UniProtKB/Swiss-Prot annotation:
Membrane topology summary: Multi-pass membrane protein
PANTHER family: INNER MEMBRANE PROTEIN YHJD, UPF0761 MEMBRANE PROTEIN YIHY
Keywords: Cell inner membrane, Cell membrane, Membrane, Transmembrane, Transmembrane helix
Subcellular location: Cell inner membrane
Record organism: Pseudoalteromonas translucida (strain TAC 125)
Domain of life: Bacteria
TM annotation in the entry: 47-67, 100-120, 143-163, 181-201, 215-235, 249-269
The protein's name: UPF0761 membrane protein PSHAa0171
Length: 300
């Protein structure tokens, strides 16, 4: 265990001691890919798709009455750990909208699912642009992947939260030997879940092979930046509540939009870091481009 820890420390130290030109390359990639513009577009699509996503998730859990408590646990966990402030107000409004959506017909539910799939498709397209991937997946495969994420995502999320809660309950017994150990573990839990989510996003979504060695530093960077952004945003809103004077009763909407925008910037910064340090950049060149390069060489 100590050998592995020292190995990772050496790798991180070597990574940080690299020439400044690497960081300039990273910054230039972020500028060239216009991550602030893409984050704004994804924030708009997310705000449009948020209620449909929740409505579809509620519909999936409604099909399994035994998972009602799990659905409530997921809602509580997400709003507590991933929304920096005003979570009660936001949760009340979104749950109300999703509840009204559940009263729609099958055609209406299908329309909501299409809007939710729109978000997943745009995330896929944005990450593929970051990895410079021009080759698209076949339409049927893309639809199958998107639908699997939409339908199985809430189930896997509920299962992971249930397993995590069980592990934390077991670890709480360690407080007898190490006071406050379970509380310390609970503080690390959002970091761990965020990091796992970022690793899955950076390795599974791009239409190329992304190694875990490249995804782990990017996911760790994104998870830490996400928590810092969440704390900073909550601190700003708590101490500078001028937005309530300007927007009044609808202040929750711009707050939610700004937070989603900042969250997407963090996601894209982590993706840029992962793509920049990925050792498979040459191997990951799309097959179409590789064929063109080989034909050019043969001609020369």
């Amino acid at each position: 265990m100590n050998d592995k820890l020292s190995y990772y420390k050496q790798q991180v130290g070597s990574f940080l001691r690299q020439q400044p030109g690497w960081w300039m390359q990273y910054i230039n990639r972020c500028i060239d890919d216009q991550i602030t513009v893409n984050a704004g577009y994804l924030a708009y699509v997310t705000l449009l798709s948020l209620v449909p996503l929740i409505a579809v998730g509620v519909a999936i859990f409604s099909a399994f009455p035994g998972f009602e408590s799990t659905r409530l646990a997921i809602e509580s966990f997400l709003f507590t750990n991933f929304v920096p402030t005003s979570s009660d107000v936001i949760k009340e409004h979104i749950s109300s909208f999703a509840g009204n959506a559940n009263q729609m017909t099958a055609v209406g539910i299908g329309f909501l699912a299409a809007i939710a799939l729109l978000l997943i498709r745009n995330v896929d397209a944005t990450l593929n642009r970051i990895w410079r991937i021009k080759k698209k997946r076949p339409m049927m495969i893309s639809f199958a992947v998107y639908w699997m994420v939409l339908s199985l995502g809430p189930v896997f999320l509920g299962g992971s939260i249930a397993v995590t809660s069980y592990i934390v309950s077991l670890v709480s017994f360690a407080d007898q030997g190490i006071p406050g150990f379970s509380g310390f573990l609970l503080k690390l839990l959002p970091y761990g879940i965020s990091m796992v989510g970022f690793i899955m996003l950076y390795t599974l979504v791009p239409n190329t092979r992304v190694s875990f060695k490249a995804a782990i530093p990017g996911a760790l960077f994104a998870a830490m930046l996400f928590e810092l952004t969440k704390k900073g945003f909550a601190l700003y809103i708590s101490h500078f509540p001028s937005y309530e004077v300007i927007y009044g009763a609808v202040a929750t909407i711009p707050i939610l939009f700004v937070w989603i925008y900042l969250s997407w910037i963090v996601v894209l910064l982590g993706a840029e870091l992962t793509a920049c340090i990925s050792p498979e950049n040459i191997e990951d060149t799309p097959e179409i481009e590789l064929d063109e390069q080989e034909n050019t060489k043969d001609t020369l």
